[in-house]
């Protein structure tokens, strides 16, 4: 076990801690008035790539709630942008990218650009680690108690946006390419797999104590494609991180994977499995490798609703995992209309002894 005063890091390393540590996906976001005040200062990419702004945004929920984890403020699409794919975030539409549909499109991507392009992200992580590990309180949080998390999009989910050129509910063009031009799609996935591993190692070197892979659209794939485009790339990334930076926990989040989630947990070599809202925590925990840390999985819409129902379900999830390494989180990200007071209520509920 890890000799550390950081509860989250202890649990990510496989130790059961009571009450469990808590952090939330999208804990730094539009539901916070202090985030909205900064949002008008710069566009989204500029906020991600400006260390002063990204550091401040990352720390906002730490100051307010003393979360046990601080996750880097960035975006899963920073990687394709860093490789040279055009990217813009359009109000009301979301991300717009220059779609990858041919060998010529793929050839324009240059993974060698990534270290220089993402240098501001690494500077943000370095600053955050110094602040979090320093002696001074960070608002409501004690210095030396908060774990710094890096992250990336998993290759399939990032490929969805790169091929489609925008967000979608089904990503038909992406899934179609995987069937109709498997060689091209495999080359894209291979490029993303190596670039993702390299970027996560760089994040670790810059200060991240654990990293998370978000595979938000993995649930779109049937089992054979899931094994090929979700499990295999994730396993390769985890193996690369373990070989280059042994002992650093990797959290996997195969959203909406359903019955494939257990196979994903067994076959990827991950230390931590994040479960989405649809998973029965206790039942799924019984299908996972012994001692594997579980993260999740309160419904974000129940957090939005708040009140006794939220508190009751939060206690039920927490109590069902007692005695097992468990990180309390949501089953997806905080939704923008969530009252900040509800997040505070949740944190207090989870930390009840």
UniProtKB/Swiss-Prot annotation:
* Enzymatic reactions: uroporphyrinogen III + 4 H(+) = coproporphyrinogen III + 4 CO2
Citing just one GO molecular function, the answer is:
uroporphyrinogen decarboxylase activity
Q: Supply the enzyme class, top level.
A: lyase
Q: Can you tell me which residues bind substrate?
A: 26-30, 75, 161, 216, 332
Pfam families, alphabetically? URO-D
Q: What are the entry keywords?
A: Cytoplasm, Decarboxylase, Lyase, Porphyrin biosynthesis
Pathway membership, UniProt: Porphyrin-containing compound metabolism; protoporphyrin-IX biosynthesis; coproporphyrinogen-III from 5-aminolevulinate: step 4/4
Q: Which superkingdom?
A: Bacteria
Q: What's its EC?
A: 4.1.1.37
Report which residue ranges the record marks as coiled coil.
none
What's any one GO cellular component for it? Answer: cytosol
Q: Name the InterPro entries on file.
A: UROD/MetE-like_sf (IPR038071), Uroporphyrinogen_deCO2ase_HemE (IPR006361), Uroporphyrinogen_deCOase (IPR000257)
What is one process in the GO biological process aspect for this record?
protoporphyrinogen IX biosynthetic process from glutamate
Site (Transition state stabilizer) location in chain: 75
User: What CDD domains does UniProt report for this protein, alphabetically?
Assistant: URO-D
Q: Where in the cell is it found?
A: Cytoplasm
Q: How does it assemble?
A: Homodimer.
- UniProt similarity note: Belongs to the uroporphyrinogen decarboxylase family.
Tell me the HAMAP family matching this sequence.
URO_D
Function summary:
Catalyzes the decarboxylation of four acetate groups of uroporphyrinogen-III to yield coproporphyrinogen-III.
Q: What is this protein called?
A: Uroporphyrinogen decarboxylase
Q: Which species?
A: Gluconacetobacter diazotrophicus (strain ATCC 49037 / DSM 5601 / CCUG 37298 / CIP 103539 / LMG 7603 / PAl5)
């Amino acid at each position: 076990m890890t000799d550390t005063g950081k509860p989250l890091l202890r649990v990510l390393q496989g130790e059961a801690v009571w009450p469990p540590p808590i952090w939330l996906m999208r804990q730094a976001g539009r539901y916070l008035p202090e985030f909205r005040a900064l949002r008008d200062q710069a566009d989204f990419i500029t906020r991600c790539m400006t260390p002063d702004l990204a550091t401040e945004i990352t720390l906002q929920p730490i100051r307010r709630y003393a979360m046990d984890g601080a996750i880097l403020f960035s975006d899963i699409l920073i990687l394709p942008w860093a490789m040279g794919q055009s990217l813009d975030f359009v109000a009301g539409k979301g991300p717009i990218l220059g779609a990858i549909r041919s060998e010529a499109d793929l050839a324009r991507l240059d993974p060698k650009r990534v270290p220089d392009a993402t240098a501001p992200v690494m500077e943000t992580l370095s600053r955050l680690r110094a602040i979090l590990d320093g002696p001074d309180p960070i608002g409501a949080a004690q210095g030396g108690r908060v774990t710094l998390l890096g992250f990336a999009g998993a290759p399939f989910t990032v490929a969805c946006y790169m091929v489609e050129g925008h967000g979608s509910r089904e990503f038909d063009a992406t899934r179609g390419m995987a069937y109709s031009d498997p060689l091209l799609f495999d080359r894209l996935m291979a490029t993303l797999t190596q670039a993702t591993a390299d970027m996560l190692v760089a994040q670790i070197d810059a200060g991240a104590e654990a990293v998370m892979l978000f595979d938000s659209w993995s649930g779109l794939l049937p089992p054979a494609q899931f094994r090929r485009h979700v499990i295999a790339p994730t396993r390769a990334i985890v193996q690369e991180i373990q070989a280059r930076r042994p002992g650093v926990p990797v959290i996997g989040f195969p959203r909406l994977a359903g019955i494939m989630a257990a196979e994903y947990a067994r076959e990827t070599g991950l230390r931590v499995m994040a479960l989405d809202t649809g998973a029965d925590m206790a039942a799924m925990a019984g299908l996972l490798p012994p001692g594997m840390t579980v993260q999740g999985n309160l419904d974000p819409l129940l957090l939005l609703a708040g009140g006794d129902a939220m508190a009751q379900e939060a206690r039920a999830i927490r109590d069902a995992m007692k005695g097992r390494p468990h990180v309390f989180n949501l089953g997806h990200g905080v939704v923008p209309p969530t009252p900040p007071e509800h997040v505070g209520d949740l944190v207090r509920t989870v930390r009840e002894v």
